[in-house]
Amino acid sequence: MENRDIIKRPVITERSSEQMAQDKYTFDVDTRANKTQIKIAIEDIFNVKVDKVNVMNYKAKKKRVGRYNGYTNKRRKAIVTLKEGSIDFFN
């Protein structure tokens, strides 16, 4: 899996915006990626040093549209903590 395929998109919410002050950045990542792969991908793409990676898995939710039942996509979210002195890569 390529590094650019692991990181899907940044997650911009009120909580993630508050965590940016503490050098914590949130991303949606591929569901098959592990913490080591996520760390290597972030360091390679953004040229920063990663201190720690926390990962959360979200199950698919059952949804109904009219008479049809289906599921939302499952997803995996990673909170990446940068080392002190790293460059702020969203600015």
From Swiss-Prot:
UniProt entry keywords in alphabetical sequence: Ribonucleoprotein, Ribosomal protein, RNA-binding, rRNA-binding
Keyword Iron-sulfur: no
Pfam families per the UniProt record, alphabetical: Ribosomal_L23
One GO MF term attached to the UniProt entry: structural constituent of ribosome
Gene3D superfamilies attached to this UniProt entry: 3.30.70.330
GO cellular component: ribonucleoprotein complex; ribosome
Domain of life, source organism: Bacteria
A biological process from GO: translation
Chaperone recorded as keyword: no
Protein function: One of the early assembly proteins it binds 23S rRNA. One of the proteins that surrounds the polypeptide exit tunnel on the outside of the ribosome. Forms the main docking site for trigger factor binding to the ribosome.
PANTHER family: 60S RIBOSOMAL PROTEIN L23A (PTHR11620)
Similarity section: Belongs to the universal ribosomal protein uL23 family.
Subunit architecture: Part of the 50S ribosomal subunit. Contacts protein L29, and trigger factor when it is bound to the ribosome.
Protein name: Large ribosomal subunit protein uL23
Organism of provenance: Macrococcus caseolyticus (strain JCSC5402) (Macrococcoides caseolyticum)
